[in-house]
């Protein structure tokens, strides 16, 4: 599972996702990629499930790059506990994403095979996505 090795603070404020992605919004490594169309938070399990879906479809050929990393802790209080008495314990990690963010890139396989793999991966994600192809292909 993806999670930071060390963090300065165990808990973080929730915050709000506003605006479009400035960084990580263009294809850097591969030929075809998944790009987000809305705000959302991807858990480490969702990121891994989409990666596995891509790898199983393209089999041995090609390379896959994961362009997001879950570095924001998520907290939760136990079931049947009254409100108050402080913030809950950390239970997992998420990667906050804005519209326009590239999530996965693929290179080294046929474009149609890569497109189908990315479509399968997009079904594992909680945000609307689109498939983008690098200029000149």
From Swiss-Prot:
Entry's Gene Ontology cellular component terms: cytosolic large ribosomal subunit
Subunit: Part of the 50S ribosomal subunit.
GO biological process terms held by the UniProt record: translation
Function: Binds 23S rRNA and is also seen to make contacts with the A and possibly P site tRNAs.
Keywords: Ribonucleoprotein, Ribosomal protein, RNA-binding, rRNA-binding, tRNA-binding
Family statement drawn from the similarity comment of this UniProt entry: Belongs to the universal ribosomal protein uL16 family.
Residues that span the membrane, as ranges: none
Protein name: Large ribosomal subunit protein uL16
UniProt region (Disordered), positions on chain: 1-22
SUPFAM superfamilies in alphabetical order: Ribosomal protein L16p/L10e
